């Protein structure tokens, strides 16, 4: 059905097994839907449950001993004991995941071989495999590095190669779990531009787990988790109006949004949402003209 969400989470609770086999709650009665083609950022402090949530979506975590509720992804009931090996393979193909440290995802001695690793294991034949690798490298702007050794690349370049490896498997959704956390500003910019391109131009559903508020400002939708519970859910502009709730969740406003709040509280008129540097600069310029 056209209106069926790509991801449906219903009353999801999940616990890790702690000392003495006692469950430690991580997610608590979480319910939400994510539509295909959305760009969603999930925010939360350390221990909020955001990374656990992401890893449940494509079976990186597959022990549901202390789990309740439902996780439906691309039509598959992820927690069902009736999932076949073919179902699991299709689920992991349709939902790719990029982790914090790109070195943990790079397995080959040449960039193009690394990108080919995933689809090759899926049984993609030549010449389609060659075409997928070339297209994936072009998408992330790494074609000229096809014959380079991955370990000689910068952090941002390595992460783009890791992303290309997922793209080559033709996913419908990509999850980025703190994928910019270990990068310098240049590397972060490269990866964020790649993520936006995948969503805007390729139509890939993007779920980005982060604690960087400026990254959240780029998304269509922001979800805030705190202590395993859903605290806020809306557009960046809607979520950032709840500054007190964000602070209680251990989060700050994006710098540009904080600047706009400062201007308003000091009697300087500012119109519209201000979540990005471009919006901030334009608002300050317009306000200056009115002074």
What are these regions (language model features)?
Residues 149-153, 157:
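Conserved ABC ATPase signature
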């Amino acid at each position: 059905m056209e209106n069926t969400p790509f991801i449906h989470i219903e009353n999801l609770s999940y616990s890790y097994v702690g000392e003495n086999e006692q469950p430690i709650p991580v997610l608590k009665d979480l319910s939400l839907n994510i539509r295909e083609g959305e760009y969603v950022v999930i925010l939360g402090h350390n221990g909020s449950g955001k990374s656990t949530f992401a890893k449940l979506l494509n079976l990186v975590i597959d022990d549901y001993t202390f789990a309740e509720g439902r996780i439906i992804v691309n039509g598959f009931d992820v927690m069902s004991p009736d999932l076949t090996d073919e179902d699991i393979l299709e689920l992991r193909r349709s939902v790719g995941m990029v982790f914090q440290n790109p070195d943990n995802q790079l397995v080959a001695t040449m960039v193009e071989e690394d990108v080919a690793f995933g689809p090759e294991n899926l049984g993609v034949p030549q010449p389609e495999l060659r075409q997928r690798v070339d297209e994936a490298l072009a998408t992330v702007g790494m074609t000229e590095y096809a014959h380079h050794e991955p370990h000689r690349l910068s952090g941002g370049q390595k992460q783009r190669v890791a992303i290309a490896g997922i793209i080559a498997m033709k996913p419908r959704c990509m999850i980025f779990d703190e994928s910019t956390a270990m990068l310098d500003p240049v590397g972060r910019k490269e990866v964020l531009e790649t993520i936006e391109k995948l969503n805007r131009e390729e139509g890939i559903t993007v779920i980005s787990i982060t604690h960087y508020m400026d990254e959240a400002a780029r998304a269509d939708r922001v979800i805030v988790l705190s202590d395993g519970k859903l605290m806020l859910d809306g557009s960046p502009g809607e979520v950032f109006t709840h500054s007190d709730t964000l602070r209680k969740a251990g989060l700050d406003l994006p710098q540009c949004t904080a600047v706009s709040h400062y201007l308003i509280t000091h009697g300087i008129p500012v119109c519209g949402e201000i979540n990005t540097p471009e919006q901030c600069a334009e608002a300050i310029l317009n306000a200056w003209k009115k002074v």
